[in-house]
Amino acid sequence: MKTRFDKAKISGICVSVPEHKICIDDELESVFSNDIKTLKRMKKVIGLNTRYICDENTCVSDLGKHAANTLLQGLNIDKNSLDALIVVTQSPDFFMPSTACYLHQLLNLSSKTVAFDLGQACAGYLYGLFVAHSLIQSGLGKILLICGDTLSKFIHPKNMNLAPIFGDGVSATLIEKTDFNEAFFELGSDGKYFDKLIIPKGAMRIPKADIFNDDSLMQTEEFRQLENLYMDGANIFNMALESELKSFKEILEFSKVDEKDIAFHLFHQSNAYLVDCIKEELKLNDDKVPNFIMEKYANLSACSLPALLCELDTPKEFKASLSAFGAGLSWGSAVLNFKDLYTKDILIYTKEK
């Protein structure tokens, strides 16, 4: 699916991560059972170093509220002027109601501000931006997009294959109506591979072997039960590489934007080696492809792209391509124009005493 919008702009972005910081080197004994070779390999290939993890009482809404309030205050936005609040997450506070409605209360928004969730993972920022642009194209004025996850809650802390890879974080983005600003999107999904990245148990469907195409996800072990995240790492890597390469090429062709005019190519920060492979295959300049979020925050799921935008030193006006791939399977790319983008260094959320 490809589409173009011309009525919306991204005015600002803030990202919040929890205060508990973990360094992978400190987990040599507790997580890696003194397997120094595996630890060093994960650091080198995936790009891991530190990550931030929520405690049991901190959820998406807490980080979202922190990021949203900071953003709205920084932009001097009247909360009553917001037309919609969208929360994109795979780790909601509750099954019912939506996290957006709960956050609506926490932010003390007007009853005229519609609130709803979108269930997307690593490609979720692009899906959220797509929906926000669609709504503004139809006449809305201001949309607050909250995007991110607390996936550490679905991973056993001693699972050395997954625990070091995922960090927690949530972004807040303000999208506003403007006179003219082109934005191009290319999105896709393939449900045949729904079980390649999945939490099999915990919702309404009872997990049974005949439901899944991947037999190995039903094979539990000491540090992975059916309530925990399962990832077919090798296949996910290969499909992410193929999908992001194809999506990137298609969005450039569709937008008719010259690659030389794009300041940054932002790829979902799930694996430093994967980003390097994409960059080399597309023959992109190193300085256009930032690749450092994994080292500082690990895989922030749908929050990794907004985290990149917050951490980059961007000019007053620039074009960027954004690409991501995640559970579903879902993927997407966009070419966006930015002007006077408000950002702050990534925020550390401290629980209120």
Which residues does each predicted region cover?
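Condensing-enzyme catalytic core mediating Claisen C-C bond formation in acyl metabolism
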Residues: 1-56, 159-238, 337-353
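Short beta-strand segments
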Residues: 11-14, 88, 119, 143-149, ...
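Acidic-glycine-rich active-site phosphate/pyrophosphate-binding loop
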Residues: 35-41, 94-108, 145-151, 216-220, ...
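Claisen-condensing/thiolase-fold acyl-transfer catalytic domains that form or cleave C-C bonds
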Residues: 61, 65, 91-92, 105, ...
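Phosphate/pyrophosphate-binding loops at sites that engage ATP/ADP/AMP, CoA/4′-phosphopantetheine
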Residues: 67-83, 245-263, 312-313
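Membrane helical hairpin/interfacial module
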Residues: 83-91
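Flexible, glycine-rich active-site loops centered on histidine and acidic residues
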Residues: 141-170
